[in-house]
Protein backbone atom coordinates (compact mmCIF):
# COMPACT_ATOMS: atom_id res chain seq x y z
CA UNK A 1 0.00 0.00 0.00
CA UNK A 2 1.27 3.50 -0.76
CA UNK A 3 2.38 5.67 2.13
CA UNK A 4 -0.52 8.14 2.48
CA UNK A 5 0.79 10.29 5.33
CA UNK A 6 0.93 13.29 2.98
CA UNK A 7 -2.64 12.76 1.76
CA UNK A 8 -4.43 11.56 4.91
CA UNK A 9 -5.79 15.06 5.59
CA UNK A 10 -6.97 15.59 2.01
CA UNK A 11 -10.61 15.01 0.98
CA UNK A 12 -12.87 15.90 -1.91
CA UNK A 13 -13.68 19.09 0.02
CA UNK A 14 -10.02 20.20 0.13
CA UNK A 15 -8.98 23.19 -1.95
CA UNK A 16 -6.71 22.69 -4.94
CA UNK A 17 -4.11 24.96 -3.33
CA UNK A 18 -3.85 22.76 -0.23
CA UNK A 19 -3.57 19.66 -2.40
CA UNK A 20 -0.75 21.24 -4.41
CA UNK A 21 1.12 22.05 -1.20
CA UNK A 22 0.93 18.39 -0.14
CA UNK A 23 2.01 17.29 -3.60
CA UNK A 24 5.06 19.54 -3.30
CA UNK A 25 6.08 17.68 -0.13
CA UNK A 26 5.50 14.36 -1.90
CA UNK A 27 7.72 15.35 -4.84
CA UNK A 28 10.43 16.47 -2.44
CA UNK A 29 10.25 13.16 -0.55
CA UNK A 30 10.62 11.33 -3.87
CA UNK A 31 13.93 13.07 -4.51
CA UNK A 32 12.80 15.32 -7.33
CA UNK A 33 15.22 18.17 -7.97
CA UNK A 34 14.27 21.68 -6.76
CA UNK A 35 14.10 22.87 -10.37
CA UNK A 36 11.73 20.05 -11.36
CA UNK A 37 9.48 20.74 -8.38
CA UNK A 38 9.46 24.46 -9.10
CA UNK A 39 8.47 23.83 -12.73
CA UNK A 40 5.71 21.37 -11.78
CA UNK A 41 4.25 23.73 -9.19
CA UNK A 42 4.34 26.68 -11.57
CA UNK A 43 2.46 24.63 -14.16
CA UNK A 44 -0.33 23.41 -11.87
CA UNK A 45 -0.81 26.63 -9.89
CA UNK A 46 -2.09 28.31 -13.03
CA UNK A 47 -5.15 26.09 -12.68
CA UNK A 48 -6.02 27.67 -9.33
CA UNK A 49 -6.26 31.08 -11.00
CA UNK A 50 -8.52 29.71 -13.75
CA UNK A 51 -11.04 27.86 -11.58
CA UNK A 52 -13.49 29.70 -9.27
CA UNK A 53 -11.91 30.43 -5.89
CA UNK A 54 -14.26 28.10 -3.98
CA UNK A 55 -13.66 25.07 -6.22
CA UNK A 56 -12.79 21.95 -4.21
CA UNK A 57 -11.03 18.83 -5.48
CA UNK A 58 -14.27 16.88 -5.77
CA UNK A 59 -15.83 19.48 -8.04
CA UNK A 60 -13.09 19.46 -10.69
CA UNK A 61 -14.18 17.59 -13.82
CA UNK A 62 -12.57 16.50 -17.06
CA UNK A 63 -14.66 19.18 -18.78
CA UNK A 64 -13.14 21.83 -16.48
CA UNK A 65 -9.63 20.69 -17.32
CA UNK A 66 -10.27 20.56 -21.07
CA UNK A 67 -11.75 24.06 -20.90
CA UNK A 68 -8.69 25.21 -18.95
CA UNK A 69 -6.23 23.92 -21.53
CA UNK A 70 -8.32 25.34 -24.37
CA UNK A 71 -8.17 28.73 -22.65
CA UNK A 72 -4.44 28.40 -22.14
CA UNK A 73 -3.84 27.44 -25.76
CA UNK A 74 -6.14 29.90 -27.51
CA UNK A 75 -7.50 32.59 -25.20
CA UNK A 76 -4.97 33.47 -22.53
CA UNK A 77 -3.17 36.79 -23.06
CA UNK A 78 0.22 35.11 -22.55
CA UNK A 79 1.25 32.94 -25.56
CA UNK A 80 1.69 29.22 -24.86
CA UNK A 81 3.93 27.16 -27.13
CA UNK A 82 3.03 23.53 -27.95
CA UNK A 83 5.97 22.38 -25.82
CA UNK A 84 4.84 24.45 -22.81
CA UNK A 85 1.24 23.29 -23.19
CA UNK A 86 2.30 19.64 -23.34
CA UNK A 87 4.44 20.10 -20.22
CA UNK A 88 1.57 21.73 -18.30
CA UNK A 89 -0.81 18.94 -19.27
CA UNK A 90 1.76 16.40 -18.07
CA UNK A 91 2.15 18.19 -14.73
CA UNK A 92 -1.63 18.43 -14.23
CA UNK A 93 -2.11 14.76 -15.08
CA UNK A 94 0.65 13.86 -12.62
CA UNK A 95 -1.05 15.80 -9.80
CA UNK A 96 -4.48 14.24 -10.29
CA UNK A 97 -3.06 10.76 -10.85
CA UNK A 98 -1.36 11.12 -7.45
CA UNK A 99 -4.63 12.22 -5.80
CA UNK A 100 -6.43 9.26 -7.36
CA UNK A 101 -3.67 6.75 -6.56
CA UNK A 102 -3.69 7.73 -2.89
CA UNK A 103 -7.47 7.52 -2.58
CA UNK A 104 -8.33 11.20 -2.30
CA UNK A 105 -10.33 11.08 -5.54
CA UNK A 106 -12.33 8.05 -6.66
CA UNK A 107 -12.14 9.20 -10.28
CA UNK A 108 -9.17 10.89 -11.94
CA UNK A 109 -10.58 13.86 -13.90
CA UNK A 110 -7.33 14.33 -15.81
CA UNK A 111 -7.09 10.75 -17.07
CA UNK A 112 -9.13 11.42 -20.22
CA UNK A 113 -7.55 14.78 -20.99
CA UNK A 114 -5.76 14.34 -24.30
CA UNK A 115 -2.01 14.79 -24.19
CA UNK A 116 -0.82 17.30 -26.79
CA UNK A 117 2.15 16.62 -29.01
CA UNK A 118 5.19 18.78 -28.44
CA UNK A 119 7.46 17.45 -31.16
CA UNK A 120 10.25 19.95 -31.56
CA UNK A 121 12.09 20.62 -34.84
CA UNK A 122 14.86 18.29 -35.94
CA UNK A 123 18.14 19.16 -34.24
CA UNK A 124 21.17 20.33 -36.16
CA UNK A 125 24.03 17.86 -36.47
CA UNK A 126 27.51 17.90 -37.94
CA UNK A 127 28.18 16.37 -41.34
CA UNK A 128 31.16 14.02 -41.66
CA UNK A 129 33.21 16.85 -43.14
CA UNK A 130 32.22 19.25 -40.35
CA UNK A 131 32.96 16.58 -37.73
CA UNK A 132 36.51 16.23 -39.06
CA UNK A 133 36.93 20.00 -39.34
CA UNK A 134 35.90 20.52 -35.71
CA UNK A 135 38.39 17.94 -34.43
CA UNK A 136 41.13 19.35 -36.65
CA UNK A 137 40.48 22.88 -35.37
CA UNK A 138 40.59 21.68 -31.76
CA UNK A 139 43.72 19.63 -32.40
CA UNK A 140 45.58 22.68 -33.73
CA UNK A 141 45.50 24.09 -30.20
CA UNK A 142 47.40 21.00 -29.02
CA UNK A 143 50.11 21.55 -31.64
CA UNK A 144 50.55 25.32 -31.27
CA UNK A 145 53.45 27.24 -29.75
CA UNK A 146 51.58 27.14 -26.43
CA UNK A 147 50.05 23.64 -26.45
CA UNK A 148 46.51 23.61 -25.07
CA UNK A 149 44.58 20.32 -25.08
CA UNK A 150 41.47 21.60 -23.30
CA UNK A 151 39.30 22.24 -26.37
CA UNK A 152 40.19 18.90 -27.95
CA UNK A 153 39.65 16.96 -24.73
CA UNK A 154 36.24 18.58 -24.34
CA UNK A 155 34.87 18.40 -27.87
CA UNK A 156 36.14 14.89 -28.63
CA UNK A 157 34.65 13.65 -25.36
CA UNK A 158 31.27 15.15 -26.30
CA UNK A 159 31.32 13.80 -29.84
CA UNK A 160 32.16 10.25 -28.76
CA UNK A 161 30.10 9.87 -25.56
CA UNK A 162 27.12 12.15 -26.23
CA UNK A 163 26.99 13.37 -22.63
CA UNK A 164 24.91 16.43 -21.81
CA UNK A 165 26.15 19.80 -20.62
CA UNK A 166 25.02 19.13 -17.04
CA UNK A 167 26.77 15.75 -17.09
CA UNK A 168 29.96 17.34 -18.40
CA UNK A 169 29.90 19.89 -15.59
CA UNK A 170 29.25 17.14 -13.04
CA UNK A 171 32.06 14.91 -14.29
CA UNK A 172 34.76 14.47 -11.65
CA UNK A 173 38.29 13.12 -11.94
CA UNK A 174 37.29 10.06 -9.93
CA UNK A 175 34.64 9.28 -12.57
CA UNK A 176 37.31 8.77 -15.24
CA UNK A 177 38.90 5.32 -15.12
CA UNK A 178 41.61 4.61 -17.66
CA UNK A 179 42.60 1.21 -16.24
CA UNK A 180 39.49 -1.00 -16.44
CA UNK A 181 39.81 -4.44 -18.12
CA UNK A 182 37.23 -3.34 -20.71
CA UNK A 183 39.18 -0.23 -21.62
CA UNK A 184 39.03 3.40 -20.49
CA UNK A 185 35.62 4.63 -19.42
CA UNK A 186 33.73 7.37 -17.60
CA UNK A 187 31.00 6.93 -15.02
CA UNK A 188 28.10 9.38 -15.27
CA UNK A 189 26.74 9.93 -11.76
CA UNK A 190 23.66 11.71 -10.40
CA UNK A 191 23.09 12.92 -6.84
CA UNK A 192 19.28 12.71 -6.91
CA UNK A 193 17.68 9.26 -6.51
CA UNK A 194 15.08 10.29 -9.10
CA UNK A 195 17.83 10.44 -11.73
CA UNK A 196 19.58 7.18 -10.91
CA UNK A 197 18.27 5.58 -14.11
CA UNK A 198 20.47 8.03 -16.04
CA UNK A 199 23.67 6.74 -14.42
CA UNK A 200 25.86 4.76 -16.77
CA UNK A 201 29.37 3.76 -17.74
CA UNK A 202 30.60 4.89 -21.14
CA UNK A 203 33.57 3.53 -23.06
CA UNK A 204 36.14 6.14 -24.06
CA UNK A 205 38.06 6.04 -27.35
CA UNK A 206 41.71 5.14 -26.85
CA UNK A 207 42.88 8.14 -28.86
CA UNK A 208 41.16 10.52 -26.42
CA UNK A 209 43.49 9.45 -23.61
CA UNK A 210 46.68 11.25 -24.77
CA UNK A 211 44.76 14.53 -25.12
CA UNK A 212 43.19 14.02 -21.69
CA UNK A 213 46.58 13.41 -20.08
CA UNK A 214 48.00 16.49 -21.81
CA UNK A 215 45.04 18.50 -20.54
CA UNK A 216 45.56 17.27 -16.96
CA UNK A 217 49.24 18.24 -17.02
CA UNK A 218 48.40 21.68 -18.39
CA UNK A 219 45.44 22.66 -16.19
CA UNK A 220 45.82 20.49 -13.06
CA UNK A 221 42.09 20.20 -12.20
CA UNK A 222 41.54 19.00 -8.63
CA UNK A 223 37.91 17.79 -8.57
CA UNK A 224 35.82 18.57 -11.63
CA UNK A 225 37.26 17.44 -14.93
CA UNK A 226 36.21 20.75 -16.50
CA UNK A 227 36.07 23.30 -13.65
CA UNK A 228 34.56 26.21 -15.58
CA UNK A 229 31.15 27.79 -15.81
CA UNK A 230 28.62 26.47 -18.35
CA UNK A 231 28.95 29.67 -20.36
CA UNK A 232 32.74 29.43 -20.50
CA UNK A 233 32.56 25.92 -21.94
CA UNK A 234 29.88 27.06 -24.40
CA UNK A 235 32.27 29.80 -25.57
CA UNK A 236 35.00 27.20 -26.07
CA UNK A 237 32.72 25.19 -28.34
CA UNK A 238 31.63 28.31 -30.22
CA UNK A 239 35.26 29.29 -30.81
CA UNK A 240 36.14 25.84 -32.14
CA UNK A 241 33.10 25.92 -34.41
CA UNK A 242 34.14 29.28 -35.79
CA UNK A 243 37.72 28.13 -36.32
CA UNK A 244 36.39 25.06 -38.15
CA UNK A 245 34.48 27.35 -40.51
CA UNK A 246 31.04 26.18 -39.42
CA UNK A 247 27.99 28.22 -40.33
CA UNK A 248 26.20 26.32 -37.54
CA UNK A 249 26.44 27.07 -33.84
CA UNK A 250 28.54 24.29 -32.28
CA UNK A 251 26.92 23.38 -28.95
CA UNK A 252 26.65 20.62 -26.38
CA UNK A 253 23.33 19.58 -27.88
CA UNK A 254 24.74 19.42 -31.41
CA UNK A 255 27.60 17.23 -30.23
CA UNK A 256 25.17 14.93 -28.41
CA UNK A 257 22.94 14.49 -31.45
CA UNK A 258 25.92 14.06 -33.76
CA UNK A 259 27.23 11.28 -31.52
CA UNK A 260 23.86 9.52 -31.44
CA UNK A 261 23.40 9.80 -35.21
CA UNK A 262 26.91 8.52 -35.89
CA UNK A 263 26.19 5.43 -33.75
CA UNK A 264 22.79 4.97 -35.40
CA UNK A 265 24.23 5.11 -38.90
CA UNK A 266 26.97 2.69 -37.87
CA UNK A 267 24.29 0.10 -37.08
CA UNK A 268 24.43 0.26 -33.28
CA UNK A 269 21.41 -1.34 -31.61
CA UNK A 270 18.80 1.34 -30.80
CA UNK A 271 18.50 0.28 -27.16
CA UNK A 272 22.26 0.54 -26.70
CA UNK A 273 22.13 4.09 -28.04
CA UNK A 274 19.28 4.84 -25.63
CA UNK A 275 21.32 3.53 -22.71
CA UNK A 276 24.38 5.45 -23.87
CA UNK A 277 22.37 8.69 -23.88
CA UNK A 278 20.85 7.91 -20.48
CA UNK A 279 17.21 8.46 -21.50
CA UNK A 280 14.06 6.59 -20.52
CA UNK A 281 12.16 4.38 -22.95
CA UNK A 282 9.42 6.99 -23.16
CA UNK A 283 11.89 9.77 -24.00
CA UNK A 284 13.58 7.48 -26.49
CA UNK A 285 10.49 7.24 -28.72
CA UNK A 286 10.81 10.82 -29.94
CA UNK A 287 14.61 10.69 -30.05
CA UNK A 288 14.52 7.48 -32.09
CA UNK A 289 12.05 8.97 -34.58
CA UNK A 290 14.29 12.00 -35.02
CA UNK A 291 17.35 9.81 -35.57
CA UNK A 292 15.44 7.92 -38.28
CA UNK A 293 14.59 11.20 -39.99
CA UNK A 294 18.12 12.57 -39.67
CA UNK A 295 19.59 9.34 -40.99
CA UNK A 296 17.54 9.62 -44.16
CA UNK A 297 18.61 13.19 -44.90
Predicted segment positions?
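Alpha-helix N-cap/helix-start motif at helix boundaries, enriched for small hydrophobics
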Residues: 92, 154-155, 162, 166-171, ...
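A short, glycine-centered helix-capping/turn motif at helix boundaries
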Residues: 103, 157-170, 266-268, 277
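DNA breakage-rejoining catalytic core of tyrosine-based enzymes
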Residues: 105, 119-135, 195-206
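Basic, Lys/Arg- and aromatic-enriched nucleic-acid-binding interface segment
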Residues: 133-161, 165
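Short, basic (Lys/Arg/His-rich) helix/loop patches that form interaction surfaces
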Residues: 143, 222-224, 235-275, 279-280, ...
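Active-site/catalytic core of tyrosine-dependent DNA strand-transfer enzymes
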Residues: 203-247
Amino acid sequence: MPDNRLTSHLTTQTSLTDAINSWEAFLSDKGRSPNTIKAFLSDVRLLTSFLPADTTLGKITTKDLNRYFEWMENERAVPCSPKTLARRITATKSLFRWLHQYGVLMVDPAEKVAQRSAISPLPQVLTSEEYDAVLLAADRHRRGSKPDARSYALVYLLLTTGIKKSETLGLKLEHVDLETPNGPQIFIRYASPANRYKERKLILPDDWIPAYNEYLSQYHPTEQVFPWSPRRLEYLLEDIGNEAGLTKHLSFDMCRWTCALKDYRAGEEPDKIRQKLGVSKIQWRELHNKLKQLSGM
